[in-house]
Amino acid sequence: MSPQTETKASVGFKAGVKEYKLNYYTPDYETKDTDILAAFRLTPQPGVPPEEAGAAVAAESSTGTWTTVWTDGLTSLDRYKGRCYHIEPVAGEENQYIAYVAYPLDLFEEGSVTNMFTSIVGNVFGFKALRALRLEDLRIPPAYTKTFQGPPHGIQVERDKLNKYGRPLLGCTIKPKLGLSAKNYGRAVYECLRGGLDFTKDDENVNSQPFMRWRDRFVFCAEALYKAQAETGEIKGHYLNATAGTCEEMIKRAVFARELGVPIVMHDYLTGGFTANTSLAHYCRDNGLLLHIHRAMHAVIDRQKNHGIHFRVLAKALRMSGGDHIHAGTVVGKLEGERDITLGFVDLLRDDFIEKDRSRGLYFTQDWVSLPGVLPVASGGIHVWHMPALTEIFGDDSVLQFGGGTLGHPWGNAPGAVANRVALEACVQARNEGRDLAREGNEVIREASKWSPELAAACEIWKEIKFEFEAMDTV
């Protein structure tokens, strides 16, 4: 460069490749209350030091790139860069480390889960220096949390809308999930709600297919829940899946649901995307609709222990983006969930303040300030014999959802719903009387079945059903 063309920005600039750890590994850094903190599980490639791998993650998910660039001189990298401030080995694992990274808040757009994830996990997971990478947890500071609306309504407002207190809510996914006509689908909804359930549900892939267009389904389901409400005197709901190919179509379906006067709609938040989900959550708050969230596709992202994103992070993101319910596994059914880990992210969904607890997979203390809570939904391979454990594990602020465990009853849908409602009421009463559901649960169910033939039939048909596989999601 000639003296005539030299600029201030180029003074001191030296082209070339530097080790990431020279700028992005800062073990003396004291985190700020406004930083977003991340815990990554690193598996470096052979020969790559963990400090270099952690620094690479911090760099590539913030301001860094593979080489020095002269435009670094036009900004303050020290203000905007991510910092790997601590690394620790994972006990019992070879060549695995937890790297803690702090991100300045100014790196992120306010109220945008999409931008947060694009920055933190958007590019770095394909980095060649890493054999595998998993985002285990995030600490979202109150300063960022306050830029989000969060759930449309939250737990207390939902209970007030439904006028239901002191017990878990009961639901059922209509089966078969695909192939029914809209009228037959509505019939199944009516039978389940009449039998005592609070909610029925579209499955995640029920959108608007040739055998059942969305508008027909919405109309027949609305008719079913109004009829069930008139007969039972209870407020009922059906999760009408508004997920669609475009945001405009999704909102159109939510508008029609509101015009029908139903209380709740549904969205597949991972396949639909965070931008669409946040838009729908805002519409639901403005128009008095509850929002049920299905986590379809989550296992693609969260199931591998050393690569991907843990579901506790996806759960935190959902609370920020917005949803009143979200599926959270069961611990006891067919879908995976180890007890302590599951209860860790269940607390992250419901509570205002959650302490750091590594035994439950919680790497950071999380303060949600005023963000409303989300009801966890337990579903997948559960039936009446699981009711005591589910009541004890999840407590009152939850939705217990029995699909096959309702529709598979030998006498039909309504008796299946009756069996589940009787089992739940018996467990809640036993708990309130001080009985130990973990130890006496089966006895409680047997006692209740003596005066409920529907429950007795359900107990008989599902007495041998078990899903005994080792959980992969462990600390």
Swiss-Prot record:
This entry's Gene Ontology molecular function terms read: magnesium ion binding; monooxygenase activity; ribulose-bisphosphate carboxylase activity
Which additional comment does the entry carry? The basic functional RuBisCO is composed of a large chain homodimer in a 'head-to-tail' conformation. In form I RuBisCO this homodimer is arranged in a barrel-like tetramer with the small subunits forming a tetrameric 'cap' on each end of the 'barrel'.
> Where, by residue number, does Mg(2+) bind?
201, 203-204
Supply the name of the protein: Ribulose bisphosphate carboxylase large chain
One Pfam family here: RuBisCO_large
Q: Which PROSITE patterns match?
A: RUBISCO_LARGE (PS00157)
The annotated active site, in chain numbering, is: 175 (proton acceptor), 294 (proton acceptor)
State the organism named in the record: Chloranthus spicatus (Chulantree)
| Record propeptide residues | 1-2
Where does the chain bind substrate? Answer: 123, 173, 177, 295, 327, 379
